[in-house]
Amino acid sequence: MKKFLLLSLMSLSSLPTFAANSTGTIGIVNLRRCLEESALGKKESAEFEKMKNQFSNSMGKMEEELSSIYSKLQDDDYMEGLSETAAAELRKKFEDLSAEYNTAQGQYYQILNQSNLKRMQKIMEEVKKASETVRIQEGLSVLLNEDIVLSIDSSADKTDAVIKVLDDSFQNN
């Protein structure tokens, strides 16, 4: 009975020590900041915005042409001045251009979504590598995404260190 009591007492007394040690080995990383503030994240975001703008410009030209044809189709005086064949051709052109626009828009969104997914995967791979480097350098047991932590001391935030490793890695490549 004395051995059990002694063992229980030793176990209980070691719990606060273990808890104190384990909290010092946990760090957090704000992924959003890594994406927005790292050189890699900024570069990838700029390339994505450039692609979006290119698509928007090409879609804008089609929209202008569709709008112009639509205005003509809605103008009764203009349509009355056309022959039946010319009016039919104008309607057909509008239908074809509308179908082409809808197809292009669907492809545009699909390409943008795929590109964004690849971009995020690439950045996340680099954040994981940088996080592992920081975890080892700082002697941490674990680095967690800040979004899953309800409360932790601000000294556990290792986001700046991860961003620095990301930037160093980006400059070396």
UniProtKB/Swiss-Prot annotation:
Signal peptide limits: 1-19
Record protein name field: Skp-like protein
GO molecular function per UniProt: unfolded protein binding
Record keywords, A-Z: Signal
Swiss-Prot/TrEMBL GO biological process terms: chaperone-mediated protein folding; protein stabilization
Record-stated family: Belongs to the Skp family.
Entry-linked Gene3D superfamilies: Skp domain (3.30.910.20)
SMART domains according to UniProt: OmpH (SM00935)
InterPro entries: Chaperone_Skp (IPR005632), Skp_dom_sf (IPR024930)
